[in-house]
Amino acid sequence: MAGNFWQSSHYLQWILDKQDLLKERQKDLKFLSEEEYWKLQIFFTNVIQALGEHLKLRQQVIATATVYFKRFYARYSLKSIDPVLMAPTCVFLASKVEEFGVVSNTRLIAAATSVLKTRFSYAFPKEFPYKMNHVLECEFYLLELMDCCLIVYHPYRPLLQYVQDMGQEDMLLPLAWRIVNDTYRTDLCLLYPPFMIALACLHVACVVQQKDARQWFAELSVDMEKILEIIRVILKLYEQWKNFDERKEMATILSKMPKPKPPPNSEGEQGPNGSQNSSYSQS
């Protein structure tokens, strides 16, 4: 693992400009409102979380998978590859990169099938439609997009250091950790360094637990304006999440989501089993 975040591909290539991110998203916003797009982000983060828990993966593996998912759709439209295929593909790749051990082909497909059927049947009435050959091809596109920049830095380690420095580990760490987990339902991991996200989550935890940490934060040499920007995003997430009824809303939103268009049936375009073209679009 790269020892220095500031020299890593995460910082040099994958801290994005907010305006560029919104510009790339315009293709999808022709079909979805901003609020619907945001709900899709929450939903597919929940799918990845459920998949990871079903496979008994560590939270860091799940977080890495979520970042991969967000990176892909930061550069490509939702219609380029079906997110239902991309979600388990990201879990599969992250489990290898984070040295958790390769999730076997059979376990991955069984997990995706089970999770969609038991946890998300309100959104996906049909069976999980993909096989392992689809996942492997999707993994190729994902690796190509990320230019094999696979090391992801997360807020967990800096958060632990900050809480220990503050001397309030038992009081603040569990809540701040949960807030970090929730930030993966936003664009924050694409826009800010992990240490800033950790500080913002710690700040929110201090406010909730009524811990006066103003002096501690005042002594940091960090751009507090950026920390406040992150806090505003976190508070907005909780405000909107409160009114989001996944079970009632997701089927309609998914029906509006742009879908991959099968390319013309010409020679050489048929997939390994003759059917995967419906999950990819090169447009």
Curated annotation (Swiss-Prot):
Chief place where the protein resides: nucleus
Gene Ontology cellular component annotations, sorted alphabetically: CKM complex; mediator complex; nucleus
Annotated Gene3D superfamilies: Cyclin-like
Gene Ontology MF annotations: cyclin-dependent protein serine/threonine kinase regulator activity; identical protein binding
Compartments it resides in: Nucleus
Pfam families: Cyclin_C_2, Cyclin_N
Family the UniProt entry places it in: Belongs to the cyclin family. Cyclin C subfamily.
Protein name listed in UniProt: Cyclin-C
Organism: Bos taurus (Bovine)
Lineage: Eukaryota, Metazoa, Chordata, Craniata, Vertebrata
Gene: CCNC
